[in-house]
């Protein structure tokens, strides 16, 4: 998937009746050693409530999958965006995350009056923005964004498991678990690993040392 590719959805039916459009924005994948950082922006429809929204990490996989479909169906507008591994290595993970959030908001077909961002800092956006610490547990639109981002990234990690067997990617989703770290040492890094992250950098250095010998 290219760095500019996005998934989008919208429902114009009730846009005119909503006076204050608020987008929730969240990210998944800052901590993993491999794969893109994925973001989502969601504008919920107040006339089509979605029950059970919560921080995606607090939901079961089955519940997230169900809510993913419901969010895509009922939200006024939504967009899933990303920053690729190459961008993470070039910019650093913080700036790459901010870039991916900007892409998610820019991909909305309806411009919100306010963007509520999970965390303690906001990307530069053309509308008013507000950072909300633990926002995915407090703001429904942010919770919805966290679900879209996590389901999308988890699906991608499951696909990578087939391409790069032996790393356990579908289980740890790229996070630096003992299983992942051991595989990184044993098998070496893959093209989807983030060179700027210390364990990956050390794995490359170890390989280079072996080649020199």
Curated annotation (Swiss-Prot):
It catalyses: Endonucleolytic cleavage to 5'-phosphomonoester. Residues 20-209 form the RNase H type-2 domain. It is found in: Cytoplasm. A divalent metal cation binds at residues 26-27, 118. GO terms for biological process: DNA replication, removal of RNA primer; mismatch repair. Its EC number is 3.1.26.4. One of its GO terms (molecular function) is RNA-DNA hybrid ribonuclease activity. Its cofactor is Mn(2+); Mg(2+). Pfam families: RNase_HII (PF01351). It comes from the Bacteria. GO terms for cellular component: cytoplasm; ribonuclease H2 complex. Keywords: Cytoplasm, Endonuclease, Hydrolase, Manganese, Metal-binding, Nuclease. Manganese or magnesium. Binds 1 divalent metal ion per monomer in the absence of substrate. May bind a second metal ion after substrate binding. Endonuclease that specifically degrades the RNA of RNA-DNA hybrids. NCBIfam families: PRK00015.1-1, PRK00015.1-3, PRK00015.1-4. Belongs to the RNase HII family. This is Ribonuclease HII. The lineage of its organism: Bacteria, Pseudomonadati, Pseudomonadota, Gammaproteobacteria, Pseudomonadales. The gene is rnhB.
């Amino acid at each position: 998937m290219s760095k500019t590719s996005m998934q989008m959805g919208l429902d114009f039916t009730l846009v005119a009746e909503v006076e204050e459009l608020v987008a929730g924005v969240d990210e998944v994948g800052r901590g993993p050693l491999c794969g893109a950082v994925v973001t989502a922006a969601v504008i919920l429809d107040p006339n089509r409530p979605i029950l059970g929204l919560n921080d995606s990490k607090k939901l079961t996989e089955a519940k997230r999958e169900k809510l993913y479909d419901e969010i895509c169906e009922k939200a006024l507008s939504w967009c899933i965006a990303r920053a690729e591994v190459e961008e993470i290595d070039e910019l650093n993970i913080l700036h790459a995350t901010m870039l991916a959030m900007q892409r998610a908001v820019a991909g909305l077909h309806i411009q919100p009056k306010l963007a509520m961002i999970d965390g303690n800092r906001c990307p530069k956006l053309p509308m008013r923005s507000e950072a909300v610490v633990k926002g995915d547990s407090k703001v429904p639109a942010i919770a919805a964004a966290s679900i879209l981002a996590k389901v999308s990234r988890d699906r991608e990690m499951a696909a990578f498991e087939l391409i790069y067997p032996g790393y356990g990617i579908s289980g740890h989703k790229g996070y630096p678990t003992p299983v992942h770290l051991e595989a990184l040492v044993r098998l070496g890094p893959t093209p989807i690993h983030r060179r700027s992250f210390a364990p990956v950098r050390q794995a490359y250095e170890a390989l280079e040392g072996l080649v020199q010998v």
